[in-house]
Amino acid sequence: MSSVVVVGTQWGDEGKGKITDFLSEHAEVVARYQGGNNAGHTIVFGGVKYKLHLIPSGIFYKEKICVIGNGLVVDPKALLEELKYLHDRGVSTDNLRVSNRAHVILPYHLKQDELEEASKGDNKIGTTKKGIGPAYMDKAARIGIRMADLLDREAFKEKLEQNLAQKNRLFEKMYDTEGFSVDEIFEEYFEYGQQIAQYVCDTSVVLNDALDNNHRVLFEGAQGVMLDIDHGTYPFVTSSNPIAGGVTVGTGVGPAKVTRVVGVCKAYTSRVGDGPFPTELHDEIGHQIREVGREYGTTTGRPRRVGWFDSVVVRHARRVSGLTDLSLNSIDVLTGIPTLKICVAYKCDGKVIDEVPANLNILAKCEPVYEELPGWTEDITGVRSLDELPENARKYVERVSELTGIQLSMFSVGPDRNQTNIVRNVYEA
């Protein structure tokens, strides 16, 4: 039995999709365990670039089972659009499985998300307005509608009527806007459910059977540790748990069945949306990193904020996710910068801080303590081993591994699959 979890160690957008796609080649099953279609990942397969938001990266391998676990919230309309996107490009989706326990995003979740974000004014958290948060709210409040309900005409209508009575009061009384009628939603979304029905099953059984039969299972996280609702920069976070612990509740696979946890990070730091960002760059170097690294959101198109590599953040990710392996991406983006900086600690009110503060007022006041390293000018995009890296690039990579306390297993020097290099096999480690 071998199972590997891929976790983002920063604020998302670390290149998890590419690493998951790369590791998918040696897995029999690929599963997502949290989030929804708020997370975009770009994959290059067969020389073609694909942008996915909900379906696991392993979908391009028709012999591999791809699972959307119970921990996700699924917009049926968005899922069908993504299925069509793949079908139009000749990609089969017969290998997809969707949990019957996954919660469903409905039009009132999208509306609630938009209205709540607008009402916060300057205190907005930067939601993608995909209805993710409100759907998770309903799940916690025990009024959510699950995939199993969506497929049952009577159960779906009954739950929808109950929910709309409550949601419409919210829209009318709090936001002074019209709500929805049952007829507006019911037939359309019940039909979506019927189109998705062929994929829906108990995915916990699928995953545990695979592991019990010694198949390799890859768990694909979305977002990153710093966006985790418990361990991230709350409230500037997502509504689920991207950390490795999210696998257990989000798939129905026990923690003892997880063997390795790969932390994915970029050789610098980026984030979309609001919230403290200690190493953020507002200068020409920041602009260079953004443009060379194409730092624009896959889902929103928003320019990402960028900054120097923050080892405090990645050490935090190592601790809360139990990271066993490091995949360092986008090293090539730093080529040509004369002096590179790595944040080794924070300083606040004269005190050195080695951990990420829970209090965001303190984090906002933190100044990074930097260690400087010389850069390199050589083109490294064709490098295929650590030994081939220029001395300064190799020292930078080694220092990142030392400061984070995570063993380097993979590194990448460009966006293509063949630019991802294996230092050690995470399935056999």
From Swiss-Prot:
PROSITE patterns from the UniProt entry: ADENYLOSUCCIN_SYN_1 (PS01266), ADENYLOSUCCIN_SYN_2 (PS00513)
Name of the molecule in the record: Adenylosuccinate synthetase
PANTHER family associated with the record: ADENYLOSUCCINATE SYNTHETASE (PTHR11846:SF0)
Amino-acid positions noted as binding IMP in the UniProt annotation, renumbered to this chain: D13, E14, G15, K16, N38, A39, G40, H41, T128, R142, Q223, T238, R302
TM region positions: none
Record-linked InterPro entries: Adenylosuccin_syn_GTP-bd, Adenylosuccin_syn_Lys_AS, Adenylosuccinate_synth_dom1, Adenylosuccinate_synth_dom2, Adenylosuccinate_synth_dom3, Adenylosuccinate_synthetase, P-loop_NTPase
Amino acids binding Mg(2+): D13, G40
One GO process term, biological-process aspect: IMP metabolic process
Subunit structure: Homodimer.
Pfam family name, one: Adenylsucc_synt
Signal peptide per UniProt: none
Organism name: Bacillus anthracis
Annotated substrate binding sites: T298, T299, T300, G301, R302, P303, R304
Molecular function via GO: adenylosuccinate synthase activity; GTP binding; magnesium ion binding
Enzyme Commission designation: 6.3.4.4
Domain of life per record: Bacteria
Enzyme class label: ligase
Gene name of this polypeptide: purA
